[in-house]
Amino acid sequence: AANQHLCGSHLVEALYLVCGEKGFFYNPNKVGIVEQCCHKPCTIYELENYCN
């Protein structure tokens, strides 16, 4: 999969798709995922790190 810049609602939607029923940990105040996927492009595998 190509690297993607994902911010805000796009990031949340991508997490829903990747994590499915497992759910995910999304805290926009915590730098992690926004740094990794919004400011820089990230991969599906990086998104999976945020699944529960």
UniProtKB/Swiss-Prot annotation:
Pfam entry (one): Insulin
Q: Which domain of life is it from?
A: Eukaryota
Known SUPFAM superfamilies for this protein? Insulin-like
Q: What is its main location?
A: secreted
Molecular function terms from GO? hormone activity
Q: Give the Gene3D superfamilies listed for this entry.
A: Insulin-like
Compartment list: Secreted
Q: Which UniProt keywords apply?
A: Carbohydrate metabolism, Disulfide bond, Glucose metabolism, Hormone, Secreted
List the CDD domains hit by this protein, alphabetically: IlGF_insulin_like (cd04367)
Q: List the disulfide bonds.
A: 7-38, 19-51, 37-42
- Which family does the entry's similarity section mention? Belongs to the insulin family.
Oligomeric state and interaction partners are given as: Heterodimer of a B chain and an A chain linked by two disulfide bonds.
Tell me the function of this protein. Answer: Insulin decreases blood glucose concentration. It increases cell permeability to monosaccharides, amino acids and fatty acids. It accelerates glycolysis, the pentose phosphate cycle, and glycogen synthesis in liver.
Q: What is this protein called?
A: Insulin
Q: Which gene encodes it?
A: ins
